[in-house]
Amino acid sequence: DLWQFGKMILKVAGKLPFPYYGAYGCYCGWGGRGKPKDPTDRCCFVHDCC
């Protein structure tokens, strides 16, 4: 779920997930479309697919 995904981002990246990644790239945040712009955005894309 989104809560667990946020906890994982905090642990791995050491940053609060929503201020830093809430509107990042094409897939981090609400919705998503297009091609992921980098590995971080790809991780959000994969999360959206599950």
Curated annotation (Swiss-Prot):
Residues where Ca(2+) binds: Y27, G29, G31, D48
Reactions this protein catalyses: a 1,2-diacyl-sn-glycero-3-phosphocholine + H2O = a 1-acyl-sn-glycero-3-phosphocholine + a fatty acid + H(+)
InterPro entries in alphabetical order: PLipase_A2 (IPR001211), PLipase_A2_dom (IPR016090), PLipase_A2_dom_sf (IPR036444), PLipase_A2_His_AS (IPR033113)
Gene Ontology CC: extracellular region
E.C. no: 3.1.1.4
Cell compartment(s), UniProt: Secreted
Keyword field contains Calcium: yes
SS bond partners: C28-C44
Active site annotation, chain numbering: H47
Gene3D superfamilies: Phospholipase A2 domain (1.20.90.10)
Regulation: P-bromophenacyl bromide (BPB) completely inhibit the catalytic activity whereas it only partially reduces the toxic activities. EDTA and magnesium ions partially inhibit the catalytic activity and partially reduce the toxic activities.
Job description of the protein: Snake venom phospholipase A2 (PLA2). In vitro, shows anticoagulant activity and induces cytotoxicity when tested on C2C12 myoblasts/myotubes. In vivo, when tested on mice, induces myotoxicity (intramuscular injection), edema (injection in the subplantar region) and lethality. Also induces neurotoxic effect on mouse neuromuscular preparations and has bactericidal activity on the Gram-negative bacteria E.coli (ATCC29648) and the Gram-positive S.aureus (ATCC 25923). The catalytic and anticoagulant activities of BnpTX-I are higher than those of BnpTX-II.
Known partners and oligomeric status: Dimer.
Family according to the record: Belongs to the phospholipase A2 family. Group II subfamily. D49 sub-subfamily.
Remarks, miscellaneous: Has a pI of approximately 7.8 and about 121 amino acids.
Protein name per the record: Basic phospholipase A2 BnpTX-1
Native source organism of the sequence: Bothrops pauloensis (Neuwied's lancehead)
